Amino acid sequence: MPTLQCEFWNVGQGLFSSGRIQMGDAPAFHWVYDCGTNSSQKLIQNAIQEYNQQENNADIDLLVLSHFDRDHISGIKELLKNRRKIKHWVVPYYPLWQRLVIALLLDIQPDDEEWAFYQNPIQYFKTYFAEELKETKFLLLPAKKNESEISISLNPSSFDDVLSFETTEKLSNEFDNLEQLEPNVHWLNPDKALLFGKGEEQFEFVLYNVPFHLLAKVPTNLTAFQKQVKQIIQSHQSNSTDPTPALKTLYTLAFGNGSKHKNIISQYLYIRNITSTAVWGLGNNYIYDIPKNDGNEIIVFPKDRNKNAILYTGDAFLNDLPLLTDLTQSLGVERMARIYCLQVPHHGSKHNWQQGLANIFSPCLSVFSADSQRRNGHPHSEVLKDFATYTPILVNKNKRLFIHSI
C-alpha cells in the first residue's frame, strides 16, 4: 500500500513543508510547498540541511510556491544548492496587466527585486537558477474562469514518468523569447488536477489560483480599466520609458490610496490518494512530542482513514464569502470532506480568517506555522479558538511536525 508522509519544518515566521509518496520499491515522489522565513535565516538553512540528509539530496518532483513574499521563498537558493534538480515548478499565471496591478497593490516598486518576477516570472527564476532549471518543466497555472469543480478526468496532453497533466492553449506570447526554455513551458488547464501514480494507485495534486476579480476591489467597468492599463504599458514599451507613474495615477483613481482592498495571490495545493478505500480506526490522531537536539519533533500517526488529504493555503485570504465560496466550489464536496491536514492561512492571522472557518474545513489537524514572538503576534487568539477542536499544532522556531502515513 502506498504511503503519503509530510513535514512542516521549524522555520519560525515562515513556511517550509515537504513530503513524499512511496509506492513499493519505486523511487519516492517528492514535493515542496514554500521555503522561507522572516525569522533567522539560520532556521531555514538548518531545516534544509536536515531535509537534505533525510531525503539523501533527492531531486524535487514538484515545487509549488504560494506567492513571493520573503517568508515563503527566502530558502529557495539554499534548497537548490549542490545542483539539485526541480522536475516540475508550478508558477501562478496572471496576464501582464493584472500582474502589474497586483504588484502595485502590494506596494512593490520597480527598483524592488520582486518587481522582476511580476514582469516575467520565468525569466526571474532563470536569472537566479539557470543551471539548475535547464531541465525543469515550468507549469503555468491560470486562474479558473468558471465555478465548476476541478476534475480528475484527464485527456493527458502532457505526461512523463512522474506526472500526468492536461494543458490548454497558450494564453500569451510573452515567454516566447526564452528560446532554450520554451519547450519546457506548459500552460496548465486550471480545471484539471495533476495525477501521479503507478497501476491502479493514483494521487491527485489539485492547484488553485484566486480569480483576479476576487483579489482586489476592482473597478466596476473592468474591461475599460484593462484597456487603459494595456495602453499605458504599450506606449511606454515603445518609448522604452517607465510606465509606473502613469499606472500609479490610474490605480489610485481606480482603487484609492493604500492597499486596504488588496488580497494577495496565494496558490493553493491539495494532495490526496484518490484510489484509497480504507476506512478503519475512526478517531483523530496518535500524537507524540519527541525531544531533539535542536528542539522538539511532533510526530502524528493518523487514525481516521476517512480523511486522507492535505490542503496548503499559503497566505491566502478566506475572510469573506466570495473567496471561500470560489475555493470550496473548485475543490468540491468530496475533497472538502477528505481534508485531514489543513495549513491554516497566513500563520493564523485574523485578517485572513472569518468566524466558523474551522468548521467549514473540519480538518483532523490544523497546522499553524508561525513565530508568536514576532510583532504580528501570529497566530491570533481568535483563530486559535476557532480551531481549538481541530487539533491545532503550532510549528515554530523550536517545533517541527512529521505526519506519518496519511
Q: Where are each of the predicted segments found?
A:
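Active-site-proximal segments of catalytic enzyme domains
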Residues: 321-324, 339
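Active-site metal-binding motif and surrounding structural segment of the metallo-beta-lactamase
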Residues: 29, 42-91, 332-351, 363-366
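Flexible, acidic/histidine-containing loops and adjacent segments that form or flank the divalent-metal
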Residues: 2-4, 82-309, 389, 397-400, ...
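N-terminal helicase ATP-binding lobe
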Residues: 1-3, 13, 48, 53-57, ...
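Active-site environment of divalent metal-dependent phosphoester hydrolases
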Residues: 13, 68-73, 95-98, 317-320, ...
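C-terminal regions of proteins
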Residues: 19, 345, 349-362, 367-406
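A short acidic, amphipathic alpha-helical/loop segment
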Residues: 46-47, 75-79, 323-330, 353-360, ...
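Conserved beta-strand hairpin/beta-sheet module of binuclear metal-dependent hydrolase folds
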Residues: 1-53, 285-319
